From Swiss-Prot:
Similarity annotation: Belongs to the ATPase alpha/beta chains family.
Cellular compartments annotated: Plastid, Chloroplast thylakoid membrane
EC number, as in UniProt: 7.1.2.2
Name of the protein in its database record: ATP synthase subunit beta, chloroplastic
Length: 493
């Protein structure tokens, strides 16, 4: 680990290199400096002064281009309202730095690492620059290992890779937020890890809702912030493209500290990775670069790779990333999602149909995929159980049209048995969540992978054919299902 990435003490602004604004085009501005005092690419420069109304101005920008004639072009991280030509610009001499460490837990930050939750300043003793290189090959952990989440449907059918990247697909209201909060809760309890949530181009309302729900479910503990399990970094939809383009790096930098220094397993959520690309496209156009395919920036692959390659497992710890992916116009060949897919190890697809049936988490067992589901990685027992579950559910899906038209009685004996087992499997894939206890009234359940495999093997083998299907709904392991069946039998007697 390169300790030089992290610096003690809050970053201070140097004022030795002072320039003046020569041009402002929306969120992009040009500044002229004296010869020999030019800031470097990616340096943070700060515009200080007063607007015509006499209000103080403090706008941080990031240098993107050196134009010649001692001029630089920079992208603003906040609104440029009130800036005028001739205003002084101060070179900080370094890239943007943000606070890292335990002080970030339970707090909400903007792209600059400033708290925006009105809970007072952050006493950051350690800061880190947001532009860092990916870990060297010698530091990487090459072992393929599963990241156990305690969520049955994920661990069995689309397991996450430790240090991998997972795409989360789902529309509004199907349970993305609840699934995210349960993962944050489980990594803290089972792995002793923490989470960082990067809201990239989020709706402000959604960001606020997430924060309120996290407080309600005790993922964020307002009374004792040090007991919180997550740090939040928001760059909302209404902010300039520069802020939306860099907020993902701010969140990643905070996650890297927990991995490299605290040697923890970290979950990094990015919602939405498409907005990161979209912001980069806006900045690229403002900087005058020639657009590439479908109007995207020519540096799309480089920008995505720069972010994704930093998300990995090292010998010290891991960052496992779950990224919500918006697919524009449902076109999977669009350059933005297509570039994202190249980096993903697994996909978790949420289904509105399952949510409508009341099966939560509403993860689609047939559409969700994982590169980890190979017999030489997960073992023959896990692989064969998962394939058996998928085969049974696929057959049930094929028979649904016949059932709808002719009814169950017209099916063969074998098909009726398949349907009965598939309905049990479908219900057993549901699970009560810790963070949803306030809604369901049922205590949350963490189910180990071994218990998950055992349960589905028993359903597939026919051992539990005599149990009613409602016994499998919203339970943890298979023992709870058999106990629930006994209770149902007593109540109906």
């Amino acid at each position: 680990m390169k300790t030089s990435f992290f610096s003690l003490g809050a970053s201070t602004v140097t004022t030795k290199n002072v320039g003046r604004i020569t041009q402002i085009i929306g969120p992009v501005l040009d500044a002229a400096f004296l010869p020999g005092q030019m800031p470097n690419i990616y340096n943070a420069i700060i515009v200080k002064g007063q607007n015509p109304a006499g209000q103080e101005i403090n706008v941080t920008c990031e240098v993107q281009q050196l134009l010649g004639d001692n001029r630089v072009r920079a992208v603003a991280m906040s609104a440029t309202d009130g800036l005028t030509r001739g205003m002084e610009v101060f070179d900080t001499g370094a890239p943007l730095s943000v606070p890292v460490g335990e002080v970030t837990l339970g707090r909400i930050f903007n792209v600059l690492g400033e708290p925006v939750d009105e809970l007072g300043p952050v006493n950051a003793t350690i800061t880190s620059v947001i532009h860092r290189s990916a870990p060297a090959f010698t530091q990487l952990d090459t072992k393929l290992s599963i990241f156990e989440t305690g969520i049955k449907v994920v661990d069995l059918l689309a397991p996450y890779r430790r240090g991998g990247k997972i795409g989360l697909f789902g529309g509004a209201g199907v349970g993305k937020t609840v699934l995210i909060m349960e993962l944050i809760n489980n990594i803290a309890k089972a792995h002793g890890g923490v989470s960082v949530f990067g809201g990239v181009g989020e709706r402000t309302r959604e960001g606020n809702d997430l924060y309120m729900e996290m407080k309600e479910s005790k993922v964020i503990n307002e009374e004792n912030l040090s007991e919180s399990k997550v740090a939040l970094v928001y760059g909302q939809m209404n902010e300039p493209p520069g802020a939306r383009m860099r907020v993902g790096l701010t969140a990643l930098t905070m996650a890297e500290y927990f991995r490299d220094v605290n040697k923890q397993d970290v979950l990094l959520f990015i919602d939405n990775i498409f907005r990161f690309v979209q912001a980069g496209s806006e900045v690229s156009a403002l900087l005058g670069r020639m657009p590439s395919a479908v109007g995207y920036q020519p540096t799309l692959g480089t920008e995505m790779g720069g972010l994704q390659e930093r998300i990995t497992s090292t010998k010290e710890g891991s960052i496992t990333s779950i990224q919500a992916v918006y697919v524009p116009a449902d076109d999977l060949t669009d350059p933005a999602p297509a570039t994202t897919f190249a980096h993903l190890d697994a996909t978790t697809v949420l289904s509105r149909g399952l949510a409508a049936k009341g099966i939560y988490p509403a993860v689609d067992p047939l559409d969700s995929t994982s590169t980890m589901l190979q017999p030489w990685i997960v073992g023959a027992e896990h692989y064969e159980t998962a394939q058996g579950v998928k085969k049974t559910l696929q057959r049930y899906k094929e028979l649904q049209d016949i059932i709808a038209i002719l009814g169950l009685d017209e099916l063969s004996e074998d098909d009726r048995l398949t349907v009965a087992r598939a309905r049990k499997i479908e219900r057993f894939l549901s699970q009560p969540f810790f963070v949803a206890e306030v809604f369901t009234g049922s205590p949350g359940k963490y189910v180990s992978l071994a218990e998950t495999i055992k349960g589905f093997q028993m359903i597939l083998s026919g051992e539990l054919d005599h149990l009613p299907e409602q016994a499998f709904y919203l339970v943890g392991n298979i023992d709870e299902a058999t106990a629930k069946a006994a209770t149902i039998q007593v109540e109906s007697a």
